[in-house]
Amino acid sequence: MPEEKIRLTQLSHGGGCGCKIAPAVLQKILAGTTGSIIPPQLLVGTETSDDAAVYQINAQQAIVATTDFFMPIVDNPRDFGRIAATNAISDVYAMGGTPLFALALVGMPVNVLPLETIGQILQGGEDVCRAAGIPIAGGHTIDSVEPIYGLVAIGLVNPEHLKRNSGAKSGDKLILGKQLGVGIYSAALKKDQLQAKDYEAMVETTTQLNTPGPVLACLDGVHAVTDVTGFGLAGHLLEVCKGSGLRATVNYQDLPVLPKAREFMQAGLMTGASGRNWASYGEGVRIADGLEGIAQTLLTDPQTSGGLLVSCSPETVTEVLSLFLQHGFPHVSVIGEMAEGEPGIDVI
């Protein structure tokens, strides 16, 4: 990696979606709250930990609203902005929605970072929003100890095409749109063990918009969609399992993985979030003998701007794979299936 004048990753205690509060801790925090009102127009709220809130405004239209922000996962300021914006917009796509506009969320140590650097972060976000065809229509800024950037993303979806994370059916096949290993690569970057070509692969996957989402939403054979982010593949798949009342089988050898991820794992490179994720939900995951260590690391690896996870009928698999390929996702893979059983995951 070329030397940066200021290493953004050294200004924060965590980076990317690895900054998320661990699932078990978050549950304890929320348990102490009274809960929100739930109007009938609120089609999706917090019930199944879905990707975005959805509020119906008429028979054909519902608003999709979401927000994501985090601390730097890379040192290049423009790349940081691009990754954060791509990650935020992804939740709209995951619900089957089309993005409309965004608001910027900016927290920066203005006495530490040059204003030009902060401007480059914001420019990266603008670049991605332009690629998505939406404006950044406003936002909010604060002077903070660590660099923080993200978006509020607003979209629109036809309620009939809305895809939740709780609609999977027994017999469905599971399809993952992007490679895993982003958190592992970020750990390697912090240790100065990520070569330029590996960095480019990491940025390429984390800045690719999940544009298949709205098209997938129109397919009757697609029953559930979510995106894989900070809780790792296992965490987000468990949300699908619990919401749908089903059990998933994941074929470990079929998981698409960034080229150096397994090598880095064997060298002990991983994020702290991986361990926190396992502590939060590991009891819901059964890993076959001989796979325990390395599979656990990959399954819990926090993905920043990860791929769409699709649960669809076997008859729809070919169409879904073709759609991903048409949108430029060459690593899309069938990784498992859903079946009747106690909600959880078996890794074989």
UniProtKB/Swiss-Prot annotation:
Q: Which GO terms describe its molecular function?
A: ATP binding; magnesium ion binding; selenide, water dikinase activity
Alphabetical UniProt keywords: ATP-binding, Kinase, Magnesium, Metal-binding, Nucleotide-binding, Selenium, Transferase
Gene Ontology CC annotations of this record: cytoplasm
What EC designation does it have?
2.7.9.3
Site (Important for catalytic activity): which residue positions?
K20
Which Gene3D superfamilies does the record associate with it?
Answer: PurM-like C-terminal domain, PurM-like, N-terminal domain
Q: Known SUPFAM superfamilies for this protein?
A: PurM C-terminal domain-like, PurM N-terminal domain-like
Q: Any idea what this protein is called?
A: Selenide, water dikinase
